[in-house]
C-alpha cells in the first residue's frame, strides 16, 4: 500500500491511485482486496488414476495434475488425495465419507466440489462457502467435526482458482461458482431448497448473500460478514460507489430466509461494525452471536459458537 497523503472523501490520493488505477476495473480491485488462494493441498483423481492409500492416513498429493473426472459420474467415482499441508485429523473411515467431484460453472470453469456425509439422517445440509486463504483440503477436517456436532451434512466447493478449480478468482466467478454448487447439491444429491442452509465465512459471505438474495432456502448463516470491499479497505466509506466490490450490504435486505449473523467483537480483518450493519439490514435476522474478544479466525474456538449453531438449527428451524 502507498504512504498516506492528502485525503479525498476519506481516501488518500495515493490509496485511490493504487486501488483504482492499476488497472481501474472492479475485478482487479476485488482481487487486491480479497483473494489469497493457497497452494493446493489436495488432488481429485478419477477411478483409473487411483492408487491405494495407507489406512488411517491421507495419501500424499501426486505431483502431476489429475485429469478432470466426468461431471455426471455418480458419487464415489473420484477419490480425494490430501497433502501433508491439509492437516487431516481423522481416520480412513471418515475420509471414506467424503465425496468429491467436478461441476462446471456458467463461466465455463471447472469447479471442485465436496460432499461430507456427517449425519445421513439429518434434515439439513450446509452449503458452505469458505474463507479466502484456504481450500477444501484444509477445510475437510473442520467440515467433518462441525457436521458431526451440529448434525448436518456439509457440501462445499473451491472458488475458481482455488484448489482444483480452474480459472481465476474474481467477483463474477464467485457468483457463478456458488450457483453451480447450488445446482449440483440440488440435482446430484436431491436436496431441496427448504433443506439447505447457506453458510458463508468471511469472503464466503459474499456469494452466500448474493445467492440468498435470489433464492429462498431454509436459513442463512453469515460468519464474519463484510458490507463491501471498500468498506473493509477504507472504514470511513459511507456509501456504495459504482466501482465498489462485493456490495453485500445492498443485497442483504432482499434475503427472505432467516439469517444468523456471527462476528467477533475484536475482529482485526473485518471490523465488528460490518456484522452489526448486516444484522440491522436483515429482514428476518434471528438473535445474533457476538463473540466477545474473538478475532477473525478464532470464533470456532469459543464454546458459544457451537452452542448457538445447535440452538439455531435444532430448535429455531423446522425439524420434522
Curated annotation (Swiss-Prot):
One of its GO terms (biological process) is positive regulation of protein localization to endosome. Its main location: membrane. It holds the Pfam family Hydrolase_4. Expressed in brain (at protein level). It is a lipid-anchor. Keywords: Cell membrane, Cell projection, Endosome, Hydrolase, Lipoprotein, Membrane, Palmitate, Postsynaptic cell membrane, Synapse. The keyword Membrane applies. Its EC number is 3.1.2.22. Residues 50-75 are annotated as: Disordered. It catalyses: S-hexadecanoyl-L-cysteinyl-[protein] + H2O = L-cysteinyl-[protein] + hexadecanoate + H(+). Palmitoylated on cysteine residues located in a cysteine cluster at the N-terminus which promotes membrane localization. Palmitoylation is required for post-synaptic localization and for depalmitoylating activity towards DLG4/PSD95. Coiled coil: none annotated. InterPro entries: AB_hydrolase_fold, Hydrolase_4. GO terms for molecular function: palmitoyl-(protein) hydrolase activity. One of its GO terms (cellular component) is endosome membrane. The active site is at residues 202, 267, 296. Residues 55-65 have a biased composition (Pro residues). It is found in: Recycling endosome membrane; Cell projection, Dendritic spine; Postsynaptic density membrane. Hydrolyzes fatty acids from S-acylated cysteine residues in proteins. Has depalmitoylating activity towards DLG4/PSD95. Belongs to the AB hydrolase superfamily. ABHD17 family. This is Alpha/beta hydrolase domain-containing protein 17C. It comes from Rattus norvegicus (Rat). The gene is Abhd17c.
Amino acid at each position: 500500500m502507498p504512504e498516506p497523503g492528502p485525503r479525498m472523501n476519506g481516501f488518500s490520493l495515493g490509496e485511490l491511485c493504487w486501488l483504482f488505477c492499476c488497472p481501474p476495473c472492479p475485478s482487479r480491485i476485488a482481487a487486491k482486496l480479497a483473494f489469497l488462494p493457497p497452494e493446493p493441498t489436495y488432488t481429485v483423481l478419477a477411478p483409473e488414476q487411483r492408487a491405494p492409500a495407507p489406512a488411517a492416513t491421507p495419501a500424499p498429493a501426486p505431483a502431476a495434475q489429475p485429469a478432470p473426472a466426468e461431471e455426471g459420474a455418480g458419487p464415489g467415482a473420484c477419490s480425494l488425495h490430501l497433502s501433508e499441508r491439509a492437516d487431516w485429523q481423522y481416520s480412513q473411515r471418515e475420509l471414506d465419507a467424503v465425496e468429491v467431484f467436478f461441476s462446471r460453472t456458467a463461466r465455463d470453469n471447472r469447479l471442485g466440489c465436496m460432499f461430507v456425509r456427517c449425519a445421513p439422517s439429518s434434515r439439513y445440509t450446509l452449503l458452505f462457502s469458505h474463507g479466502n486463504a484456504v481450500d477444501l483440503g484444509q477445510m475437510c477436517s473442520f467440515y467433518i467435526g462441525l457436521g458431526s456436532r451440529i448434525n448436518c451434512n456439509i457440501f462445499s466447493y473451491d472458488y475458481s482458482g482455488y484448489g482444483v478449480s480452474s480459472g481465476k478468482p474474481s467477483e463474477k466467478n464467485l457468483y457463478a461458482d456458488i450457483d453451480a454448487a447450488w445446482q449440483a447439491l440440488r440435482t446430484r444429491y436431491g436436496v431441496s431448497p427448504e433443506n439447505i442452509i447457506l453458510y458463508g465465512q468471511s469472503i464466503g459471505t459474499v456469494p452466500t448473500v448474493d445467492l440468498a438474495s435470489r433464492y429462498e432456502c431454509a436459513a442463512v448463516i453469515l460468519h464474519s460478514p463484510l458490507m463491501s470491499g471498500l468498506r473493509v479497505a477504507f472504514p470511513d466509506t459511507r456509501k456504495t460507489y459504482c466501482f465498489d466490490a462485493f456490495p453485500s450490504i445492498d443485497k442483504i435486505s432482499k434475503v427472505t430466509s432467516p439469517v444468523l449473523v456471527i462476528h467477533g467483537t475484536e475482529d482485526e480483518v473485518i471490523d465488528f461494525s460490518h456484522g452489526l450493519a448486516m444484522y440491522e439490514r436483515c429482514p428476518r435476522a434471528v438473535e445474533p452471536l457476538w463473540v466477545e474478544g474473538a478475532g477473525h479466525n478464532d470464533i470456532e474456538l469459543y464454546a458459544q459458537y457451537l452452542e448457538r449453531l445447535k440452538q439455531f438449527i435444532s430448535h429455531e428451524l423446522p425439524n420434522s
